[in-house]
């Protein structure tokens, strides 16, 4: 059975990565795809763990070579997902999660219409700005640039299947877990996963 592709997007500072990481710690059936980026790593980030960090020139070479399943320019830096991180895993029956922006999500949905997409919103603009400043990872210039892009990013929430409001962290994690569980219980999924049982039950 082919795996399920999940897409999670949010405006910068919404807590997307924290929610995704906490959810995947509880759910070992989904693999997080590691994205490529042309930006410099932050102090707490590690190559091949948080991102594959490459130069802007190398990223452009990968674009020209057709290596990316999706890619986009996000806050003046390139980000993208390699084909090899997605298609082989899905074909092998593994569920894959892409943590990407709305531009990349739109590209992915055009290629895989049945991908399940989730958008995370903050409880308020003030909370979003507070989180961006508290994480202490970006300069004031970068924070201002990210805040300026917030409205456009959040305006795309209605392109996604599910919306989670990250007001209380544990609630948001539980809601994401519930989406994954509900996906596995869909009739078309259960029909394939339990084909022998269903065939036996329905045989006169």
Curated annotation (Swiss-Prot):
Keywords for this protein: ATP-binding, Cytoplasm, Kinase, Nucleotide-binding, Transferase
Domain Guanylate kinase-like as annotated: residue spans: 3-181
GO MF annotation, one: ATP binding
Name under which the protein is recorded: Guanylate kinase
Main EC class the enzyme belongs to: transferase
UniProt entry tagged with the keyword Transmembrane: no
Subcellular location: Cytoplasm
One GO CC annotation: cytosol
Family label: Belongs to the guanylate kinase family.
InterPro entries, per database record: GK/Ca_channel_bsu, Guanylate_kin-like_dom, Guanylate_kinase, Guanylate_kinase_CS, P-loop_NTPase
Reaction(s) this enzyme catalyzes, per UniProt: GMP + ATP = GDP + ADP
Originating species: Xylella fastidiosa (strain 9a5c)
Protein's job: Essential for recycling GMP and indirectly, cGMP.
Taxonomic lineage: Bacteria, Pseudomonadati, Pseudomonadota, Gammaproteobacteria, Lysobacterales
Pfam families found in the cross-reference section: Guanylate_kin
EC number: 2.7.4.8
Binding site for ATP: 10-17
Main location: cytoplasm
């Amino acid at each position: 059975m082919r795996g399920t592709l999940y897409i999670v997007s949010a405006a910068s500072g919404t807590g997307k990565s924290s929610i995704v990481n906490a959810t995947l710690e509880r759910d070992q059936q989904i693999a997080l795809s590691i994205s490529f980026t042309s930006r410099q790593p932050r102090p707490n980030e590690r190559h091949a763990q948080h991102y594959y960090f490459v130069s802007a020139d190398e990223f452009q070479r990968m674009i020209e070579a057709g290596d990316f399943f999706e890619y986009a320019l996000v806050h003046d830096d390139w980000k993208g997902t390699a084909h090899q991180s997605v298609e082989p895993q899905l074909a092998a029956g593994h569920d894959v999660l892409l943590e990407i922006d709305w531009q990349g999500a739109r590209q992915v949905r055009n290629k895989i219409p049945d991908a399940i997409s989730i958008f995370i919103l903050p409880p308020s603009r003030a909370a979003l700005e507070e989180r961006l400043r508290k994480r202490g990872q970006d300069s004031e210039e970068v924070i201002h640039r990210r805040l300026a892009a917030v409205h456009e990013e959040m305006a795309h929430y209605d392109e996604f299947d599910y919306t989670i409001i990250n007001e209380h962290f544990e609630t948001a994690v539980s809601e994401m877990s519930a989406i994954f569980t509900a996906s596995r219980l869909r009739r078309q999924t259960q029909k394939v996963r339990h084909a022998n049982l269903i065939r036996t039950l329905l045989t006169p």
